[in-house]
Amino acid sequence: MKKQNLVEMEGTITESLPNAMFRVCLDNGCYVLAHISGKIRRNYIRILIGDRVKVELSPYDLSKGRITYRLRIKSINDSNDLIK
């Protein structure tokens, strides 16, 4: 169940840390320390440096968050198909 008072932002993984922790650069330029949510961990979704992710932040501590979704990166072939 999703909580109402969370702040959700998008960002890019910049560093992989031990214990499934990651440093994420948000779109506004801030860096946060984020861990993987249970659904991502349970479904063995790989998160690598450079991936775009959605991060939930608590309004009480904006320096820590939880990665809830890995965004799909459009490949070059997909963009060429759209042009034709």
From Swiss-Prot:
Annotated ranges, domain S1-like: 1-72
GO CC, one annotated term: cytosol
Subcellular localization(s) per the UniProt record: Plastid, Chloroplast
NAD listed as a keyword: no
Lineage top rank: taxon: Eukaryota
Entries under InterPro entries matching the protein: NA-bd_OB-fold, RNA-binding_domain_S1_IF1, S1_domain, TIF_IF1
SMART domains hit by this protein: S1 (SM00316)
UniProt keyword terms in alphabetical order: Chloroplast, Initiation factor, Plastid, Protein biosynthesis, RNA-binding, rRNA-binding
Annotated GO MF terms: ribosome binding; rRNA binding; translation initiation factor activity
Function (record text): One of the essential components for the initiation of protein synthesis. Stabilizes the binding of IF-2 and IF-3 on the 30S subunit to which N-formylmethionyl-tRNA(fMet) subsequently binds. Helps modulate mRNA selection, yielding the 30S pre-initiation complex (PIC). Upon addition of the 50S ribosomal subunit IF-1, IF-2 and IF-3 are released leaving the mature 70S translation initiation complex.
PANTHER family the record matches: TRANSLATION INITIATION FACTOR IF-1, CHLOROPLASTIC (PTHR33370:SF1)
Subunit structure: Component of the 30S ribosomal translation pre-initiation complex which assembles on the 30S ribosome in the order IF-2 and IF-3, IF-1 and N-formylmethionyl-tRNA(fMet); mRNA recruitment can occur at any time during PIC assembly.
Family in the record: Belongs to the IF-1 family.
Protein name in the entry: Translation initiation factor IF-1, chloroplastic
Origin species: Spirogyra maxima (Green alga)
High-level lineage: Eukaryota, Viridiplantae, Streptophyta, Zygnematophyceae, Zygnematophycidae
